[in-house]
Amino acid sequence: MSEDRAVRLSSQQILYTKAAILSAALTGSILTSYALFNRYLKQYTRVTQIPLSAFRKNWLYGKVTSVGDGDNFHLFHTPGGILGGWGWARSAPKLDKVNNKRSDSLKRLFFPRFLRRQKEQEKFQSLNVPFKGRRNLPTLSIRLCGVDAPERAHFGNAAQPFSEEALIWLRHTLIGKFVWIKPLSLDQYGRCVAKVKFWSWTGWKNVSLEMVKNGIAVVYEGKTGAEFDDERDIYIFHEQVARKERRGLWSLKKFETPGNYKKRVG
């Protein structure tokens, strides 16, 4: 009898041990899955949700849903992309298409800019904006790093030259597209200052740098809050090239930088 009892106790101990091991493994698996989800698949719907550990280190992926000014836009965060379920398990917002005039498209197709001798402003005014922006979505407010676009009309103050062209270019380039952003800091308005990149048929493009190259933004002049992700010299170089070749706003005889404009109008 004592031997049978010992066998039963031993069997029970083995079962308890197996149950404990299985429970620990299951708990560990759940905790690991939760940690991985938070790190790679958790959607951020507000800038304040971005963890401090992500700044200057991680890249976030998402869809541009609206462009409100020449140097900022709204991003719908889609972590993980297709692998994260977007497009089949989770849905990103759809944007309505803009009906562009056929004549404009044909004009650009058969009469290249260098033959039409367009003025600098007309180059940007002729760009098509493919989609209408959508507001009131759970998006991240993004401010482009390293640049200042010409100021649009605000509070009764006149718009700067090329402010509308900068807005058109940014909408043409970004709206409706999926981009990568690298958070760098938060500005005084609660926006995420970030480096923004997208893929084109010629390779990766830095949005801020492309604006400087096209002469529709200047290198950020502020003494505080300037973010270049250690690439300020590259921005300065391309601004000098754009100035020398009189691209965009540098084609003007007189130009007041956005920084000086904001100081003047207060």
Curated annotation (Swiss-Prot):
Annotated ranges, domain TNase-like: 58-252
Localization (cell): Mitochondrion; Membrane
Enzyme active site: R143, E151, R191
Entry GO MF terms: endonuclease activity; metal ion binding
Matching Pfam families: SNase
EC numbers, comma separated: 3.1.-.-
GO (cellular component) term, any one: membrane
Keyword Transferase tagged: no
Residue stretches spanning the membrane: 15-37
Binding-site list for Ca(2+): D148
Membrane topology: Single-pass membrane protein
Keyword Transmembrane in record: yes
Keyword annotations from UniProtKB, A to Z: Calcium, Endonuclease, Hydrolase, Membrane, Metal-binding, Mitochondrion, Nuclease, Transmembrane, Transmembrane helix
Main location (coarse class): mitochondrion
Family the entry assigns: Belongs to the LCL3 family.
Protein name: Probable endonuclease LCL3
